[in-house]
Design a protein with these regions (language model features):
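Oxidoreductase cofactor-interface core, primarily capturing Rossmann-like NAD(P)-dependent enzymes
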Residues: 2-29, 36, 50-52, 60-63, ...
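Active-site regions of enzymes building and remodeling cell-envelope glycoconjugates
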Residues: 40-50
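A hydrophobic C-terminal alpha-helical subdomain
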Residues: 11-12, 32, 219-280
Length: 280
């Protein structure tokens, strides 16, 4: 099996890059996709998921694949369906699809439509539905921490079972390389429920800086997203899913990470200490 060629979509992101690293460590041949400029000697190939350009070449001679829709697209089905259809056409040995926690709440959502298409494809598959990522605080939400020492979000006091993207990647890599849990979907979470005040306190402890959480209006975040160049449709999507978070829909933890990896998931304290330099 270790001679199989595994294709990783989104290979330059937090999750995809870690999936690539783990697969290489296990002896698999890997190929990653990116929309960015590719350096010489890289194991990456260029794919434009919006147009479909490069998908056929990327999947050439591939045995297994990890599929995801990158940030920036609110109609994830239009991104994922061509990938699922190509995987089906090539009869891949295993496909792992990442959507999000709650994607199966309605059959009409773009993510759920993609899940159903994969479930009905006849392929061996797994679906991974992670809760919100801890790494959002050192990427998407980091500007307020740098400029004001504040996490600025319309999240209320809702608790969240945040998960570390390193655990998400480890689960994906494990499922890609085994058929033990074939044709199952897994909601995956971190080990604890925390609110954004608790996250701010953990970042403060890790950095020695005073970081606080300040609730803002959804309209304020929406304006900030638009001014930073986020497409209107995707900004609306972000506000909508944060609304679900605020209502408590992400207050979920379970034992699926430990069930699959045979170890406990990474908690808030380790995350904050490992990424402290991002907030200095």
């Amino acid at each position: 099996m270790s001679k199989d060629l595994v294709l990783v979509f989104g290979a330059t992101g937090n999750i995809g890059s870690e999936v690539m690293r783990l697969l290489k460590n296990e002896g698999f041949r890997v190929r990653g996709t990116t929309s960015q400029t590719i350096p010489k000697g890289s194991d990456l190939v260029h794919v434009n998921l919006a147009t479909g350009e490069g998908i056929d070449a990327a999947m050439d001679r591939v045995d297994r694949a990890f599929l995801m829709s990158p940030p920036g697209y609110s109609d994830q089905y239009s991104i994922l369906s061509p990938l699922i259809q190509e995987a089906k056409r090539r009869n891949l040995k295993k496909v792992v699809l990442m959507t999000s926690l709650g994607a199966n709440s309605s059959d009409s959502t773009p993510f759920r439509r993609a899940e159903l298409e994969l479930e009905n494809s006849g392929l061996s598959y797994n679906i991974v539905r992670p809760n919100w990522f801890y790494q959002n605080f050192n990427t998407f939400w980091v500007s307020g921490i740098h400029s004001q020492g504040k996490i600025l979000l319309p999240a209320g006091n809702a608790q969240v079972g945040f998960i570390d993207t390193r655990d998400v990647a480890a689960v994906i890599e494990k499922l890609l390389t085994t058929n033990q849990h074939s044709k199952q979907a897994f909601d995956i979470t971190g080990p604890e429920l925390v609110d954004h005040n608790t996250v701010a306190n953990a970042i403060s402890s890790a950095t020695g800086k005073v970081i606080t959480y300040q609730e803002i209006e959804p309209e304020t975040l929406f304006s900030g997203l638009i001014s930073s160049g986020v497409p209107n449709e995707y900004a609306e999507f972000i506000i909508a899913i944060l609304g679900y978070l605020r209502k408590g829909c992400s207050a979920v933890t379970n034992g699926n990470v430990e069930f699959i990896l045979k170890r406990e998931p990474i908690g808030l304290g380790k995350y904050a200490n490992d990424y402290r330099n991002a907030w200095l």
